[in-house]
Structure formats: structure tokens, C-alpha cells
Amino acid sequence: MSVLQEIIDGVREDLEPRRRDLPEARLAELVAAAPAPRDAHAALHGGRTDPAGIRVISEVKRASPSKGALAEIPEPATLARAYERGGASAVSVLTEARRFGGSLADLDAVRAAVDLPVLRKDFTVTEYQIHEARAHGADLVLLIVAALDDAELAGFLQLTESLGMHALVEAHTPEEIERGVAAGARILGVNVRNLKTLDVDPARYAALADGLPEDVVRVAESGVESEAQIKAYAAAGADVVLVGEALVRHGAPEEALRAFRAASLTVR
């Protein structure tokens, strides 16, 4: 069984008690009462040419399957505000509990603390999770192409947009990129992590992203550990980089974020 499938199985198990405690009818009421979505597409678009530097989605991430514990992050809101001061264009919040140590409470705290679009980063395999994300104020949801068939991908994307949110559609291979584009992805993440081995190869980004439609927002995911990698992704045409580990492990994430954005300008 792949690591991805193990995580998805755990996500489905953890979802069941939430569905029992919060029936869909009540969830729909919470969606209707949620604050209006923030325009994530507008916030992320144009990073290839922005004179202020590449866009950054900064992540609240306590742990990962490949590295284990990364940072305690007792106050996600405090970290999110530092990201906002440092120039982040959006904040990603892990809500998967077993492997990443996240929660919907983290999402609530971050959404209330910043004025930036907020991504609920989880393993979306049901429509319920999309409604749940909106009920908790998410502006973006993650859709992993490898976890969904074509009908699910297109349907989840349509549902996400019908609720006023955008989707970060994540692909790892040329075939997944084709599927994401065919489904109508407007924000497409190219993740250079191998889902079977969890190894990261940042050099693959340029080849994978080459040929993406010009109007698609290009997000580089995984492998961002230094300013040199930011430069490489920017040179390869990324609009956005998603950075988690390098920021949560840094003693001064606000300063690190500013340095990352400035580094991208050297290749313009």
C-alpha cells in the first residue's frame, strides 16, 4: 500500500465521527453563515512578472510523513500573522491529524488572524470535506489528482468553485498535469515529491511545468529549503512557491519569507 493510500484511509476513518456529529444539513447552515471567500486566484496570479517577487503560500505545518515532527506551533495564528507581515500571498493550513498534526481548529485560528486567502491543505476525497472547508472559512482547497478519478476531480473542482472558493490542483506526473488541465484547473501545483518513496527532486519542476497553459497559475511544491531553490523555481516560470518546513523550522519566519521573495528577483 502506498503512503498516499495509507493517509487517505486514515482521513476516511477520521472523517466518520465528524460526519456523525455534524450532519450535512447542519453543515450547509454553517457554510451559508461563513464569511465570504477571499479571492485566492487574484492573490496568486501574476507571480512570474510581479516586480515585488514570486508569490509565496506559507504553510502552518507541524509534521510530515517524510520528516516526522517539524515544529510545535502552539499558536498557529501568531505564525500566520508573521507570514502576512513577511509578504505571504496566502497561508496554507494542514488539517490532517495523523501524519501532519493539523486540525480544523488551526484553520479557524488562522482564518481569523489574517486577511490573506487561506488554503485548507488536506486529502480531499469526499464532497463533505469541501463543504467542511468552506464552513471553517477556507478560501482554497487542495485536490490531489493522484487521489481522485476524472469524474471526482471535475466534480470536486466544480463544487469548490460553486462555493466561491478556488482549488489548488496538485499533480506529480505529466499525465496528472494533463488530467488537471482537462478538468479545468486554474491553479495547478506541480509537486516534485515522489508519492511512493517520498523523495524530492526539485530539478523535475521545469520539465513538468513546461507546456502548462499561460493562464494557469503555476505553483511549485516541495523542495524549497533555500534561496537557491526559490531562484530555480522562479527561473522555471513558477508564479508561486509553497513553503512549509523551511519556514516553520526557521527562527525568524518573517525575515526568511522576505529573503525568499527577494531572491526570486535576481532571475527576472
UniProtKB/Swiss-Prot annotation:
Question: InterPro entries from the entry?
Answer: Aldolase_TIM, Indole-3-glycerol_P_synth, Indole-3-glycerol_P_synth_dom, Indole-3-GlycerolPSynthase_CS, RibuloseP-bd_barrel
Cite the HAMAP family for this sequence: IGPS_B (MF_00134_B)
Task: Please identify the protein, giving its name as recorded.
Answer: Indole-3-glycerol phosphate synthase
Under Gene3D superfamilies, the record lists: Aldolase class I
Q: Which family does it belong to?
A: Belongs to the TrpC family.
Indicate whether Protease appears among the record's keywords.
no
Superkingdom of the source species: Bacteria
**Which one of the record's GO molecular function terms can you name?**
phosphoribosylanthranilate isomerase activity
Which reaction is the catalytic activity of this chain?
1-(2-carboxyphenylamino)-1-deoxy-D-ribulose 5-phosphate + H(+) = (1S,2R)-1-C-(indol-3-yl)glycerol 3-phosphate + CO2 + H2O
CDD domains, sorted:
IGPS (cd00331)
Which gene carries the instructions for this protein?
A: trpC
Q: What is its EC number?
A: 4.1.1.48
> Which segments cross the bilayer?
none
Per the UniProt record, the source organism is Micrococcus luteus (strain ATCC 4698 / DSM 20030 / JCM 1464 / CCM 169 / CCUG 5858 / IAM 1056 / NBRC 3333 / NCIMB 9278 / NCTC 2665 / VKM Ac-2230)
